[in-house]
Regions:
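Non-catalytic cap/lid and distal C-terminal segments of serine-dependent acyl enzymes
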Residues: 1-225
Length: 225
């Protein structure tokens, strides 16, 4: 209660407001130079007309408007469907309550096959968890250096994937061998490998990219197009 989120909306020039567009939902705001990439892909016809929603993690402010708590880990690293529920019931309805600069209604497809979610680090695991618990909302997931470590239970997800019938979700996972290590939480790169192995075992449609990068979106941005 009381948590505030800032978000930005990307509307491609090709959007006519007459039928629902696909959705790209980006965590931690605009990453990977996404609007520029989307402009290029939509114009070339390699990507359907897609509205981008870029959300910052929540903050709580005092009566003077000063931030007194950052809620990123509590929202993004949790391993249940809470944040996905917020996307469905709070964020997307707020987005669709707006109009474009030229007065068009913002219409977003309800088909999960038309929806992708992405993020890096804690945003990466949040993307995975949102689709995992709510495949009716998202069926495309793009993650880089995801925090699948022992922070808030993310380390248990690969075992859950192996033990559960596969769902209609497609995944892209990227990480680098120089990703961060923590003596309590573990090694980010190793847990990304474990997650990819579990998804492959369970029969998911999966694409991976491994390099020698660190805990950064630099290489993930390179791969994004």
């Amino acid at each position: 209660p009381g948590t505030m989120h800032e978000y930005k909306i990307y509307i491609p020039q090709e959007y006519d407001g007459k039928k629902p567009a696909c959705l790209y939902f980006g965590l931690d705001g605009i990453l990977y130079n996404a609007p520029v990439v989307m402009d290029s892909l939509i114009t070339s016809g390699d990507m359907p007309i897609t509205i981008g929603v870029f959300v910052q993690p929540g903050v709580i402010k005092d009566t003077n408007g000063n931030v007194i708590r950052y809620n990123r880990s509590n929202e993004f690293d949790r391993t249940d469907g809470t944040f996905a529920h917020s996307i469905e019931t709070e964020i997307l309805p707020a987005v669709e309550s707006h109009k474009t600069a030229d007065g068009k209604a913002i219409l977003i497809s309800k088909d999960p096959n038309d929806r992708a979610i992405s993020g890096a680090s804690s945003g990466g695991i949040c993307s995975f968890v949102a689709a995992w618990f709510r495949p009716d909302l998202f069926s495309r997931v793009y993650t880089t250096c995801g925090t699948y470590v022992a922070m808030r239970g993310g380390n248990e997800l690969p075992a859950l994937v192996r033990k559960t019938e596969p769902q209609a979700i497609r995944f892209y996972i990227h990480d680098g061998s120089q990703d961060v290590w923590n003596p309590i939480f573990g090694h980010w790169y190793e847990y990304n490998l474990l997650m990819a192995s579990a998804l492959e075992f369970a029969g998911y449609e999966l694409e991976t990219k491994w390099d020698d990068g660190n805990h950064s979106i630099k290489n993930g941005s390179r791969e994004f197009p």
